From Swiss-Prot:
GO CC annotation: plasma membrane
Highest taxon of the lineage: Bacteria
Compositionally biased spans, kind Basic and acidic residues: 1-18
Bias type Low complexity, positions: 375-393
A Pfam family recorded for this sequence: HemX
Positions of transmembrane segments: 37-57
Protein name stated in the entry: Protein HemX
Amino acid sequence: MTEQEKTSAVVEETREAVDTTSQPVATEKKSKNNTALILSAVAIAIALAAGIGLYGWGKQQAVNQTATSDALANQLTALQKAQESQKAELEGIIKQQAAQLKQANRQQETLAKQLDEVQQKVATISGSDAKTWLLAQADFLVKLAGRKLWSDQDVTTAAALLKSADASLADMNDPSLITVRRAITDDIASLSAVSQVDYDGIILKLNQLSNQVDNLRLADNDSDGSPMDSDGEELSSSISEWRINLQKSWQNFMDNFITIRRRDDTAVPLLAPNQDIYLRENIRSRLLVAAQAVPRHQEETYRQALENVSTWVRAYYDTDDATTKAFLDEVDQLSQQNISMDLPETLQSQAMLEKLMQTRVRNLLAQPAAGTTEAKPAPAPQADTPAAAPQGE
């Protein structure tokens, strides 16, 4: 081969090598261009999606804000209506309270006028006729004396109250009261003539009898002795004399087989040991009833209780015993004691003082005070009073 041919061959080989090398480079560039296009498309898609999402979110937020604004507007409207309703109710209450306050002021003015009238009357009584108070005091004391006399039968306290009433009339130094004072003196004299009863003493005696009940001795039917209580002959203790002892015992038995006793009075009934306790307690209870009847002035109850005590003691206890005799004597004396007093039915001075109170004190209080008007304020018109406020507010 020539040198020219060799050179041509080298050139062809070089071209082939260059062509072979340029083909991968073009392929690589084409692949890079495709990747860039894909990435651009993805970026554009992402941007479009983000824009669409952002637009939708903004639109939803706008819708939510619109709904919230509408709800707030509705609430505000409701609050305004409620406020207006409460305002109207408060205005009604204020008007009602104002009317009530006005009426209360009118009533207060009326009461103030009445109080002024009373004060003027009191000033008139205390200034012009101060002695009238002494007359009222005497009238009260006489009425209290009558209450003590007829309710409590306390003659001593009633007489003391009448003396105090007479002293009050004496302090008035009024000659026109001589008749009343004379009546009070007569009432005191009539009370002094009343025979008083020692109620406390009677009650103490009844209590003493109650304490002596346990000392009473029960009646014994065999207290007069029995033929079996004493033997005419004593038995021997010797065994050898058994025949004689047997004969004596038989003789005593035959002598006492039939016994005849003579009694001039009725037999006293015997009590069992457990019944004795009940009898004593019954006697104490009747004595207590009699003691309670004394301050109550229950004459029939008092005498009936003591009669029961006397009957039971005479029936079941030994009347020959000294303690029983003293007990019965005290019961008989107390049963004859009068526990009610012969009191006057009326007090002469009471009616006289009542008449004086009518003419002097009560007529003076009934007179209108000077400087006061008889005109009374007109009642408040009903139209000024609004309807009552609801109770639930």
